[in-house]
Amino acid sequence: MGMRMFASFDEFVEERSTALLRTAFLLTGDRGHAEDLLQTTLLRTLRRWSKARAAPEAYARRVLVNLSKDRLRARGRQPRETALPPDGPDLPSVDAGYDRIADRGAVLDALAGLPPGQRQVVVLRFVEDLSVDQTADLLDCSAGTVKSQTARALTRLRELLADFHGSQHEKETTDVRR
């Protein structure tokens, strides 16, 4: 993601709020919390626009992640698992290729099943496309922690998705036999 200068806060919101909402949803697993998180993030970014203007997306992302971590600490539990959100223009897919995944719901459910730290790492590394070092900086941890959390998360996602594909295969086999 290249650095882009925005002429105004309004332009920034118009161009980037949908992507920030997607990230908030993937971090929280809950549409309502994601919308609240986005609103608070944008408000804090606006209040500090003179500081944020140089790199507003990075600034807003940091606020978003910090608010998400604060929410998790306050609740003392991982995000609520959620079903696939309703489709709509205000919550786009991760990228064009993501729409082609037939098992989008399974991917979102598997992501929701990860512990908060692993979920954050996966979202930041693979959805936001941040490097290990950028992710570590954003989460205030070491690069080694990001790498180990990523490895654990990917292993768990493979297990969860293998379970899904196994149950789908059993269902298809049963349906054919009927």
Describe every region a protein language model picked out.
Residues G2-S8, D137, L154-R178:
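C-terminal edge and immediately downstream basic/flexible tail or linker adjoining helix-turn-helix-like DNA-binding
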Residues L21, R31-R48:
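Conserved RNAP core-binding helix
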Residues K51, A55, V65-L84, D99-R100:
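Arg/Lys-rich amphipathic alpha helix in sigma70-family domain 2
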Residues V65, K69, L139-F164:
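DNA-recognition helix of helix-turn-helix
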Residues Q78-R104, S131, E170-R177:
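Internal acidic/polar
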